[in-house]
């Protein structure tokens, strides 16, 4: 049995396929979703989504949004998303390093909040590309 997974950003459908298992980062922690999951509506945090298709795993960096599960249909609405296979490792590492440096040097509440969001986004992209390159699915 499978789940139908659909990931939508404001300007495009990012992903539309069947999957056996999905792991999401929600605002209250990670959740695993299998076929016949109870209906659920949850907010998503900035983080990595892992998708199992047959025996292979692939990843995607999600930049926050919402997920709705009902009748083996998982619909994810995100602000932005990027497949791990589409991310350049070196560029993601550089962006992460710069974001970490900006966070460490941030002064004031607004600058700290903005730097923290940039750091979380960079971290999600880096984790997605690293997890994707270590999996068999590309």
UniProtKB/Swiss-Prot annotation:
Q: List localization entries.
A: Plastid, Chloroplast thylakoid membrane
Q: What is its main location?
A: plastid
GO cellular component terms, alphabetically, are:
chloroplast thylakoid membrane; proton-transporting ATP synthase complex
Alphabetized UniProt keyword annotations: ATP synthesis, CF(1), Chloroplast, Hydrogen ion transport, Ion transport, Membrane, Plastid, Thylakoid, Transport
| CDD domains assigned | F1-ATPase_delta (cd12152)
Classification via InterPro entries: ATP_synth_F1_dsu/esu, ATP_synth_F1_dsu/esu_N, ATP_synth_F1_esu_C, ATPsynth_dsu/esu_N
Per its UniProt record, what Pfam families does this chain match?
ATP-synt_DE, ATP-synt_DE_N
Extract the GO molecular function terms from the UniProt entry.
ATP binding; proton-transporting ATP synthase activity, rotational mechanism
Tell me how this protein sits in the membrane.
Peripheral membrane protein
On subunit structure and binding partners, the annotation says:
F-type ATPases have 2 components, CF(1) - the catalytic core - and CF(0) - the membrane proton channel. CF(1) has five subunits: alpha(3), beta(3), gamma(1), delta(1), epsilon(1). CF(0) has three main subunits: a, b and c.
Q: What does this protein do?
A: Produces ATP from ADP in the presence of a proton gradient across the membrane.
Q: Which PANTHER family match?
A: ATP SYNTHASE DELTA/EPSILON CHAIN, ATP SYNTHASE EPSILON CHAIN, CHLOROPLASTIC
As for family, the record states:
Belongs to the ATPase epsilon chain family.
Name-wise, this protein is ATP synthase epsilon chain, chloroplastic
């Amino acid at each position: 049995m499978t789940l139908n997974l659909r990931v939508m950003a404001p300007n495009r459908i990012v992903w539309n396929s069947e999957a056996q298992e999905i792991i999401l980062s929600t605002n209250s922690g990670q959740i695993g979703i299998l076929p016949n999951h109870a209906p659920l509506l949850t907010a998503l945090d900035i983080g990595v989504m892992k998708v199992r298709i047959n025996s292979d795993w692939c990843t995607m960096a999600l930049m926050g949004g919402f997920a709705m599960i009902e009748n083996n249909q998982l619909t994810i609405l995100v602000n932005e998303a990027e497949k791990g296979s589409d991310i350049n490792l070196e560029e993601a590492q550089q962006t992460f390093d710069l974001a970490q440096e900006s966070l460490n040097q941030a002064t004031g509440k607004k600058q700290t909040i903005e730097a923290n969001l940039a750091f979380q986004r960079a971290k999600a992209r880096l984790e997605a590309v690293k997890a994707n390159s270590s999996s068999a699915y590309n």
